[in-house]
Amino acid sequence: MPHGAKQYEGEQITMLTFDDSYFLGETRDGFYIEPMMKCAWAAQLEVMCVIQHICKKYDIPYFADWGTLLGAVRHGGFIPWDDDIDICMFRDDYQRFLAIAPKELPTEYHINNAYTEEEYSFVFSRLLNASTISYDSKRLSQFHRCPYIVGIDIFPL
């Protein structure tokens, strides 16, 4: 498998690449963005690529939502102080995604929601890249030096 590629069910997905300057701290709209936030954003985009792969494979439409939609329109990307990605799916597609995703996700990924966690109190799901913080070199490489758990909030519409 070529460097920078991920394997999903015999299919290859190329890892996102970023110029090193992307990860430098910067001030946008009067708000300082730490380099680690940039690493977290890049890691979230990797998780989003997995979602996109599954949705494309199974013809499941999704849309940017909440701060992600606002950031795309108003800031041309992330809102400087936002720390997550939000998407939504029509209810039937959302239910289908929740049924399909566990079979398609990389083993370290998992979905948290009211169906999977007894104490979960939100009306949306979170697709997470891991269950623990890790400084393992493979994970740091895969998620652009971000050791933290990152995920995507998925809202039913």
What is each model feature region?
Residues 4, 8-31, 39:
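N-terminal regions that are enriched for targeting/export leaders
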Residues 22, 32-56, 101-157:
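Conserved catalytic core of two-metal-ion nucleotidyltransferases
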Residues 52-85, 94-95:
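Active-site nucleotide-donor binding segment shared across nucleotidyl transfer reactions
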Residues 88-90:
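Short hydrophobic/aromatic beta-strand micro-patches
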Residues 92-95, 102:
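Short alpha-helix within the catalytic core of nucleotide-sugar-dependent glycosyltransferases
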